Amino acid sequence: MKKFLALLLALVMALSLAACGGNNTPADDQQGDNNGDSQYPEYFAGMEDLIAAAQAEGELTVYGSCEEEYLTAACQHFEELFGIKVNAQRLSTGEVQAKIEEENGNPSADVWFGGTTDPYNVCAAEGLLEPYAATNASHLISDMYKDADGNWYGIYKGILGFMVNTDELTRLGLEAPQDWADLLKPEYQGLVWLSNYNTAGTAKLVVNTMIQKYGHDEGIQYLVDLDKNIEV
């Protein structure tokens, strides 16, 4: 891993997103906030040597597992702040996990950004992630939003659920399922769609959630029963 670039992006990306989403002040207008001592915002004080080293490398490669628009905004703001070209590739969390494991010892990306936590935990346990101390980690409202060893930090959270096609349900004369248990009903056979557990981080999260919801054995049985209704 290109250490300078990886550390710099890890320290900055969440801050960049805050500027993209909740502050319309252009990046150029934010520079120089550190009492004239730096051309960068004040939270980068003392990082000038690190930034210069990253700029000397010139480019950054990012695997992004968040929404495309979110990833693009973060990378664009990073480029505006530091003048470092960002090459971003949008992949599912499971796909990134597979690439990182395949590239073990010869990584082609500097940073993994966004996605669900389960694949991050797997890669961390395999020693494939570089721990770092994020500048704003103390602002996270709970320790559950970061790895205890600093391998990853949460930048957003979401709610796991399922969507229904109301037009299709009307055509078939079916009521919409109201909870996860309803998805096992025989009338939904062949109507449930779910991503591949091996490649999609969200599908892995479904497995994790069902085990937490029902317990290990019942959770696994739920997934076995759900498989009978999944469209092939």
Give the residues covered by each predicted segment.
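Low-complexity, compositionally biased segments
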Residues: P26-A27, Q31-G32, G36-Y40, E80, ...
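Short alpha-helix boundary/capping motifs
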Residues: G22-D29, F82, N106-P107, N151, ...
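A short alpha-helix/helix-coil micro-patch that ends at or immediately precedes a cysteine
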Residues: A74-F82
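Acidic/histidine-rich, surface-exposed loop or edge segments in extracytoplasmic proteins
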Residues: A56-L60, L81-F82
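Extracytoplasmic ligand-binding site segments that recognize negatively charged/polar headgroups
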Residues: T61-C75, N87-E103, P107-V232
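Short, low-complexity disordered leader/linker segments with a strong preference
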Residues: M1-E57
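Hydrophobic aliphatic residue packing
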Residues: V12, I84-V86
